[in-house]
């Protein structure tokens, strides 16, 4: 947790440091297994949703003014400013960003100001370029291996996604809109037979890349790992 030190401007009687308002800004996001995580930096894929909290202390009778600044790497002017104590933002574009808090506390002629820019403790967010690949077949035989048709592990920064499965006559059998999802080889409550099916994926990456994947996939329910060993 970061604690920013105060600059006291136009102070009347000098107040004890312990009595001055302060902030300890944090970035909170969902980490592994969805657990709430606090950190100063993030390097991963989109969409990345984070909550930025000022965590003020000793505000007392001071009037608090907050300004969160979101800036892209290589740019000097923030592309977004927020003016609440806590703010939430979802990063949907690839690239590197800094997020910093400027907090000002005013009481009469007393002004106490905190700036992450001056302390060099701004939050850092890096969003990767997108990646999306799909296999050619799956084997929904209940052996726990390759039982669900899904995009390959390691997909990155996919911000919109829609996949559909059709049979050879063009009937839609299944649809899903989360790249973490997939088709278990069932249709209308029963098992779809072995054979060729048609996959259509429309997706978009955080880097603006469009994915339009149309291909034939094979359902091989009778295939097992023992077959590959022979």
Predicted segment positions?
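Bacterial Sec-dependent N-terminal signal peptides
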Residues: 1-23
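Short, compositionally biased P/S/T/A/G/V-rich stretches that sit at domain boundaries
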Residues: 18-43, 129-142
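Short loop/turn motifs at secondary-structure boundaries
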Residues: 42, 48-56, 123-230
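Surface-exposed, flexible coil segments in extracellular/virion-facing regions
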Residues: 60-89
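Extracellular and select intracellular beta-sandwich modules with Ser/Thr-enriched
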Residues: 83, 110-121, 210-215
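Signal that preferentially marks extracellular ectodomain short beta-strand elements
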Residues: 83-93, 107, 181-192
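Exposed beta-strand face motif in extracellular beta-rich ectodomains
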Residues: 95-99, 195-197
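Short, solvent-exposed loop/turn segments at the edges of extracellular beta-sandwich modules
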Residues: 104-113, 204-208
């Amino acid at each position: 947790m970061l604690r920013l030190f105060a600059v006291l401007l136009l102070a009347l009687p000098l107040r004890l440091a312990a009595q001055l308002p302060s902030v300890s800004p944090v970035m909170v996001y969902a980490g592994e297994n969805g657990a709430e995580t606090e950190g100063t930096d993030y390097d991963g894929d989109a969409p990345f949703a984070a909550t930025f909290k000022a965590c003020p202390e000793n505000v007392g009778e001071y009037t608090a003014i907050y300004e969160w600044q979101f800036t892209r790497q290589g740019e000097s002017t923030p592309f977004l400013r927020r003016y609440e104590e806590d703010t939430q933002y979802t990063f949907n574009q690839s690239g590197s960003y800094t997020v910093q808090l400027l907090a000002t506390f005013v009481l009469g002629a007393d002004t106490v100001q905190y700036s992450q820019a001056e302390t060099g403790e701004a939050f850092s967010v890096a969003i990767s370029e997108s990646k999306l690949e799909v296999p050619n077949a799956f084997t929904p035989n209940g052996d726990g291996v390759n039982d669900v048709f899904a995009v390959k592990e390691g997909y990155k920064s996919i911000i919109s996604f829609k996949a559909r499965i059709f049979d050879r006559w063009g009937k839609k059998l299944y649809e899903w809109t989360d790249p973490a999802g997939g088709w278990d080889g069932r249709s209308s409550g029963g098992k779809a037979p072995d054979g060729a099916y048609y996959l259509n994926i429309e997706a978009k990456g955080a880097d603006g890349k469009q994915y339009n994947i149309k291909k034939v996939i094979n359902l091989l329910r009778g295939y097992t790992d023992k077959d590959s060993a022979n």
